[in-house]
Amino acid sequence: RQFLAFELDADINSDVHDIRSKSIKEFEKIGFPDKKHEYWKYTPIKKVLNEKLTIFKKKRHLIEFEKVKDFFLGGIESYKIVLIDGMYDPLWSNTTHKGADICILSSVLENEKYSNVISKYFNKIIDDKESFSLLNSSFSKEGAYIHVPKNVELDKPIEIIHINSGGESSLMLQPRNLIILEKGSKAQIVESHYSLIGNNISPYTFPGYIDPLTNTLTEIHVEENANLDYYKIQNDLETTSIIDNTYICLLYTSPSPR
């Protein structure tokens, strides 16, 4: 039912809609992993899969700059894509289309201008038998889109900042990033997860509060002689669960991402 509601306003003739439909059908066959799966043998995933989790936010939560700026790289000018509870916040973001595309994924997925790029790179290198990758492909709506053209070296790093406002309980967030570095290009990216509430959550301080479950998927395509430094910082609540699948396609002369 959540999938049908999610796709209610979608273009049913789009390639992205086809990907979502195929992914949810495959997920329904496979389901969530259990201890029989080698990679999940020692991870009790059922403990974080609460039946009350939902992909739908009730409202947008506005955050003061004084709180957001604490999560920025100190003293460094950067491009920024800020996502609060999975929703893009244009107020505190700094995106661009000058020389490179550094913006939100939703702005390109259904844009005819980017159709060739999306058909070439989007959802091409994921494991289509991995449960959480399928779940992300079914429900992801927002994230970062970064495309650095041939021989372009970015003048400053990129920050992808995920913030849990604490204003909503029981959210299952599905961030999706698509990153493309063409031949001879260079970029530095820092992806981080933070929370505005402390680690002292209890049924007494936040009655009925259920920690968000973040299921992130990132596709990275690095062409010949391109150079990518990619950093991940997970500094959310101790009780928050983050599932992160990062898929990288390196063409043969590309140095490995650091």
Where are the model-predicted features located?
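N-terminal amphipathic, basic helical "cap/leader" segment at the start of enzyme domains
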Residues: 1-134
